Amino acid sequence: MSEYSLFTSESVSEGHPDKIADQISDAVLDAIITQDKYARVACETLVKTGVAIIAGEVTTSAWVDLEELVRKVIIDIGYNSSDVGFDGATCAVMNIIGKQSVDIAQGVDRSKPEDQGAGDQGLMFGYASNETDVLMPAPICFSHRLVERQAEARKSGLLPWLRPDAKSQVTCRYENGKVVGIDAVVLSTQHNPEVSQKDLQEAVMELIVKHTLPAELLHKDTQYHINPTGNFIIGGPVGDCGLTGRKIIVDSYGGMARHGGGAFSGKDPSKVDRSAAYAGRYVAKNIVAAGLAERCEIQVSYAIGVAQPTSISINTFGTGKVSDDKIIQLVRECFDLRPYAITKMLDLLHPMYQETAAYGHFGRTPQQKTVGDDTFTTFTWERTDRAQSLRDAAGL
């Protein structure tokens, strides 16, 4: 972090319109994968006043009641009444999903699964840093926790006048690559009309901001901006149109690392936009957990229909205990980054994706989950189970 003395990241709640779209797209993916693990899914969603539109390309033997599924996601988020401007029970649901192009399929599918080609060309990044216990940048971690707490306070009834839409932003101060303070906090939350701004700001400060952020990082000069424009009654898809894939920096590292541009939600693991980004995080996190570097960014790239990455690059920003070239060699020895191998390595053919679609895909805790007869582990790319083998291979 020597490049910046201040760094800011933002997050958005599950009720933000773009996140509604992401969650619907991943709910569709999960529902299909539950029945057909090898389905090809690319699902895009648009939400606006009174309507949810799902589109994209799917090749599967599964049958899913997509209208019912879309409505359930919207209602579970908290849009269950016209009073909040959007109601999953009464909104229109349009389904214009088609089939995957045969041209793409012939480039991806192989008789030997391990030779499966990448679903598209592209470049993906993974990142890890030792500045937090989850090996993620602090500004995005704190931003996620604020909007998670907003949803918790809303759903539990602690602050019943909160509505689903919210955004957060945190500015951290760094010295010698370590976080030494939080200089600014922004939290905008949708709310019912009857609550006063004074009551809202006091409650949000005490029960969300101070409850969530480390007290030792807050100081007398920290700036707090809670609903700085005043009223935030109109929100969600009424206030703004929501689209899948428009929060890719929120989904990843909050701007601290580079991004290849490909979104995650609605894409099955054959799409390297998603699976290779997850693999990149897995590699970078294990490198940092192994003590090979304090910070690590990895770039991988692919050509459509080709299994092997076209490049693997590493940058440890001068924090490496061994050279970046040596780490690249270790990565090639310890990780198979072909698309099929990534799917096997991270056990990605399970309905684990809707949970990733709010509050970040990285820095989360792997947990065992059961859907029907399928028991699996979520967020497998957050494991550090290869750190010791990397240390041994590096001679540390």
Curated annotation (Swiss-Prot):
InterPro entries for this protein: ADOMET_SYNTHASE_CS, S-AdoMet_synt_C, S-AdoMet_synt_central, S-AdoMet_synt_N, S-AdoMet_synthetase, S-AdoMet_synthetase_sfam
Cited PROSITE patterns: ADOMET_SYNTHASE_1, ADOMET_SYNTHASE_2
Keywords recorded for this protein, A-Z: ATP-binding, Cytoplasm, Magnesium, Metal-binding, Nucleotide-binding, One-carbon metabolism, Potassium, Transferase
Protein localization: Cytoplasm
Comment on bound cofactor: Binds 2 divalent ions per subunit.
Cofactor: Mg(2+); K(+)
Enzyme class, spelled out: transferase
Protein function: Catalyzes the formation of S-adenosylmethionine (AdoMet) from methionine and ATP. The overall synthetic reaction is composed of two sequential steps, AdoMet formation and the subsequent tripolyphosphate hydrolysis which occurs prior to release of AdoMet from the enzyme.
Name of the protein in question: S-adenosylmethionine synthase
Gene this protein is translated from: metK
